[in-house]
């Protein structure tokens, strides 16, 4: 927030930018997947509260909806799934409940955030570079500090340091031998 304040954003704008990146951490007000829609699918207040309490620590909303967080009894006895189904590695509670990929993605962005500032409401495109990171951030992120920029940063700092300098240089996942040679 101090960087956003220095750039001239007001408190409401800062809150929206942060919520876009970090999410709400709650099902309250969430599109598609919320206490009302979950109750309509058989969720109890107790289970909804349990899910909601786990949300601030998950990176994806689906992590809060599994046999470990919901319990096998609830999944089998209340929701009607079978044991083999819930033990499958690719079991997706939200999809099985009828939520579409688009609905789950939208709910995920609301609850867990986009994990990037790119596309945040109010944030000026001219300010994106201030927040660039070593890698692309989130599913929607496209920006990152180029590998050569890491080397240039070290070169700029080296004259002011006595001794060695060490820096991890992050390369994109699709980097090959030719990229390193260049």
What are these regions (language model features)?
Residues 1-182:
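Long, C-terminal-biased catalytic regions of enzyme "large/alpha" subunits
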């Amino acid at each position: 927030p101090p960087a956003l304040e220095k750039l001239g954003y007001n408190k409401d704008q800062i809150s929206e930018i942060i919520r876009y990146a970090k999410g709400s951490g709650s099902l309250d007000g969430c599109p598609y997947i919320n206490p009302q829609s979950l109750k309509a699918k058989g969720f109890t207040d107790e289970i909804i509260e349990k899910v909601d309490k786990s949300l601030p620590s998950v990176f994806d909303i689906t992590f809060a909806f599994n046999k470990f967080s919901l319990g096998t009894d609830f999944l089998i006895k209340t929701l009607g799934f079978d044991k083999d189904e819930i033990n499958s590695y690719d079991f997706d509670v939200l999809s099985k409940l009828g939520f579409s990929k688009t609905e789950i993605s939208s709910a995920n962005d609301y609850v867990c955030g986009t994990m990037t500032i790119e596309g945040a409401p109010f944030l000026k495109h001219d300010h994106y570079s201030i927040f660039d990171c070593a890698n692309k951030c989130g599913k929607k992120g496209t920006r990152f500090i180029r590998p050569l920029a890491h080397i240039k940063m070290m070169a700029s700092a080296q004259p002011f340091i006595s001794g060695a300098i060490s820096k991890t240089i992050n390369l994109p996942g699709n980097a090959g031998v030719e990229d390193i040679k260049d």
